[in-house]
Amino acid sequence: MKISKIFSIAAIALAAMSMVSCNNKKFHVTGEISNAKDSTLYFENMSLNGPVVMDSVKLDKDGSFAFDEKAPKAPEFYRLRIAGQIINVSIDSTEAVSIKAAYPTMASKYEVKGSENCSKIKELAILQLKLQANVNAIINSPNLGTDAVEANVGKVLEEYKNYVKRNYIFKEPMKASSYFALFQTVVLGNVQSLIFNPRNNKDDIKVYAAVATSWDTYFPKAERGLNLHNIAIEGMKDVRIIQAKQQQQQIDPSKVSVTGIIDIALNDNKGNVRRL
């Protein structure tokens, strides 16, 4: 057999092996959950359609666990769960994340290593728990009337949003932690509501649009990025409808002028201006 033909066959074989290797790339989530002997630990993908169980394990006395799954092409979200206790995990490509916690306080007290995004998500989760505690304290205060409760709750929510926008979302809109922040919730009167309201708050819609634009640049055609675009666009439509109704109540309808959609501009990773 000619040497050139041997080299050709070898090159094809290496290319095939490379393709298989790329398709088999995995991420790993390992660690320990103490005080949880005989409890079932679930590893779930937080898909756009809701939680999907990927794997589970019945914990021994030492609480050790190890999960691995196919690496996603864009940042994806998972969670470790025992009953109602949850630890949120973000995975970007072939990361190896290590988590240590104790049941039943794993949701608020855990250590995470190997992922900057997971560390920031932990920070956001703890901030969210503190926010909920503050809201509950205001609602349950015997010294506040209905109007005062509403005003104080609105104030702490606005302060929270401004802090998260400044220190997480607008700072790094392409990060998984920024996406995660958009979908944090708070319980108000037994109703779970999004902290950032994408339906009728034009300032919050701008936040969704900023992350959507950034994801479109860094993770083109990613399902989550496309979903953010849809949320932002629907929110813009709702705001225009509300504004139009308000204007009709205030002035002659013949004088109403409909403006265009909110214009969001961000520089992409190449320095080019991108708009939603």
Where in the sequence are the language-model features?
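Bacterial N-terminal signal peptides that target proteins for export
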Residues: M1-A10
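C-terminal motif of bacterial Sec signal peptides marking the signal peptidase cleavage site
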Residues: M17-S21
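N-proximal helix/coil linker or "cap" segments that precede and/or mark the start of modular domains
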Residues: V207-R274
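A non-transmembrane, solvent-exposed segment enriched in polar/low-complexity residues
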Residues: C22-K171
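Amphipathic alpha-helical repeat scaffolds of TPR domains
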Residues: P173-L194
